Amino acid sequence: MLILTRRPGEALYLDDNIKITVLSVQGRQVKLGLEIPAETTVYREEVYLKIKEQNRLALENTEQDLLAATELWQKKEKK
């Protein structure tokens, strides 16, 4: 993990197209401004982790559904 220190009004760049500016610091909260390309997706961590978990569960269900469908197909062909 890269750890940086910035004061309000100071910024940093990621590659050439993402600028992150510290807008303010109040107590334990830091307000950031992000200048990013429109096609860049940004999620809060808790939302991102939930999406990843839902995708994982959907993939598991798909595998189980495919196995069940294969079994049904094989039973149907035996008749």
Curated annotation (Swiss-Prot):
GO MF annotations in UniProt: mRNA 5'-UTR binding
Gene Ontology terms: biological process: bacterial-type flagellum organization; mRNA catabolic process; negative regulation of translational initiation; regulation of bacterial-type flagellum assembly; regulation of carbohydrate metabolic process
Locations listed in the record: Cytoplasm
UniProt-listed Pfam families: CsrA (PF02599)
Keywords: Bacterial flagellum biogenesis, Cytoplasm, Repressor, RNA-binding, Translation regulation
GO CC, alphabetical: cytosol
Chief location: cytoplasm
InterPro entries per record: CsrA, CsrA_sf
Top-level lineage group: Bacteria
Record has Transmembrane as a keyword: no
Keyword Glycoprotein (UniProt): no
Function as written in the Swiss-Prot or TrEMBL entry: A translational regulator that binds mRNA to regulate translation initiation and/or mRNA stability. Usually binds in the 5'-UTR at or near the Shine-Dalgarno sequence preventing ribosome-binding, thus repressing translation. Its main target seems to be the major flagellin gene, while its function is anatagonized by FliW.
Protein family according to the UniProt entry: Belongs to the CsrA/RsmA family.
Subunit composition and interactions: Homodimer; the beta-strands of each monomer intercalate to form a hydrophobic core, while the alpha-helices form wings that extend away from the core.
This protein's name: Translational regulator CsrA
Organism in which the protein naturally occurs: Maridesulfovibrio salexigens (strain ATCC 14822 / DSM 2638 / NCIMB 8403 / VKM B-1763)
